[in-house]
């Protein structure tokens, strides 16, 4: 089990949200999906960083609750980075 959790705060309809989820699923990396309108953490990150695109994605350390990384929209580089981190931690 990984020491972090990938969160995707999405909005319907959202192609970048679907693409982000599809990429993680295709690569065997678990994530938690929330609705942006109900996710106060995602809203705070979006406001603090002037994010205007969906989804708002963030990675949380399961032990401390700290946000390790965050971005908005479909970001292949960031997604690949966290897929690789996940595979490294779980020994794939």
Language-model features: locations:
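Short alpha-helical
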Residues: 15, 40-41, 77-78
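Non-catalytic, surface beta->alpha helical segment in thiol-disulfide oxidoreductase systems
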Residues: 60-92
């Amino acid at each position: 089990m990984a020491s972090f959790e990938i969160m995707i705060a999405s909005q319907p309809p959202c192609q970048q949200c679907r693409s982000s989820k599809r990429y993680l699923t295709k690569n065997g990396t678990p994530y938690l999906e929330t609705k942006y309108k109900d996710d106060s953490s995602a809203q705070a990150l979006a406001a603090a960083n002037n994010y205007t695109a969906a989804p708002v994605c963030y990675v949380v350390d399961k032990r401390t609750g700290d946000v390790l990384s965050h971005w908005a929209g479909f970001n292949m580089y960031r997604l690949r980075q966290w897929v690789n981190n996940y595979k490294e931690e779980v020994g794939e």
